[in-house]
């Protein structure tokens, strides 16, 4: 497993070198998020690209059909290389490692803002600004609707969770009630 880990980190580092040399790091980050989203929403693609019953050229044609008009040509070719080398199973780790390296290069980070309802881009920008000051680096947020929140927001940046929602309040209340019941039963 370590050998594969080293390999796919090498792929991410190579992609970073290319994006830096092309002065296109930010565009590649956005394209990587797009790729992750497409494959996440179409899990059958993973099975297709890791299958030994489908020829390499057929896989390349599928990659072209899905991605050619939407992302940089270098990234299309990059996907073909990992498919050719039977590393498509690790596409997510490779792309996430690239995003992490690229963010470090740009002194920025990405996070997710979850709400129970749609919010404006102005509000998202406001949260980005506040978090950028708090964390000391540029923060970009991607919006996601999470119906479990009921109301309020949850922001996740660099494994830190900033939350103010009815869901978190109910969860805390439930924990306190359990704790209270356990203590009462011990008496």
UniProtKB/Swiss-Prot annotation:
Membrane topology: Peripheral membrane protein
Primary location group: membrane
UniProt superkingdom: Bacteria
Gene3D superfamilies listed in its UniProt record: N-terminal domain of the delta subunit of the F1F0-ATP synthase
Keywords tagged on the record: ATP synthesis, Cell membrane, CF(1), Hydrogen ion transport, Ion transport, Membrane, Transport
Gene Ontology molecular function: proton-transporting ATP synthase activity, rotational mechanism
Subunit text: F-type ATPases have 2 components, F(1) - the catalytic core - and F(0) - the membrane proton channel. F(1) has five subunits: alpha(3), beta(3), gamma(1), delta(1), epsilon(1). F(0) has three main subunits: a(1), b(2) and c(10-14). The alpha and beta chains form an alternating ring which encloses part of the gamma chain. F(1) is attached to F(0) by a central stalk formed by the gamma and epsilon chains, while a peripheral stalk is formed by the delta and b chains.
Function: F(1)F(0) ATP synthase produces ATP from ADP in the presence of a proton or sodium gradient. F-type ATPases consist of two structural domains, F(1) containing the extramembraneous catalytic core and F(0) containing the membrane proton channel, linked together by a central stalk and a peripheral stalk. During catalysis, ATP synthesis in the catalytic domain of F(1) is coupled via a rotary mechanism of the central stalk subunits to proton translocation.
The protein's name in its UniProt record: ATP synthase subunit delta
Species: Mesomycoplasma hyopneumoniae (strain J / ATCC 25934 / NCTC 10110) (Mycoplasma hyopneumoniae)
Encoding gene per record: atpH
């Amino acid at each position: 497993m370590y050998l594969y880990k080293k390999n796919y980190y090498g792929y991410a580092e190579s992609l970073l070198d290319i994006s830096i040399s092309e002065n296109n790091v930010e565009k590649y980050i956005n394209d990587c998020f797009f790729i992750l989203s497409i494959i996440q929403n179409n899990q059958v693609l993973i099975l297709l690209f890791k299958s030994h019953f489908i020829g390499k050229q057929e896989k390349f044609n599928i990659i072209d059909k899905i991605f050619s008009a939407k992302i940089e040509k270098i990234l299309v070719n990059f996907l073909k290389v990992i498919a050719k080398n039977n590393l498509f199973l690790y596409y997510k780790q490779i792309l996430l490692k690239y995003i992490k390296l690229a963010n470090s290069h740009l002194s920025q980070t990405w996070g997710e803002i979850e709400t129970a309802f749609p919010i404006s881009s102005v509000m998202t920008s406001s949260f980005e600004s506040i978090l950028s000051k708090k964390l000391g680096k540029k923060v970009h947020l991607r919006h996601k609707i999470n119906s479990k929140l009921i109301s309020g927001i949850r922001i996740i940046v660099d494994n830190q969770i900033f939350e103010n929602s009815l869901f978190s309040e109910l969860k805390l209340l439930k924990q306190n009630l359990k704790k209270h019941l356990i203590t009462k039963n011990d008496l």
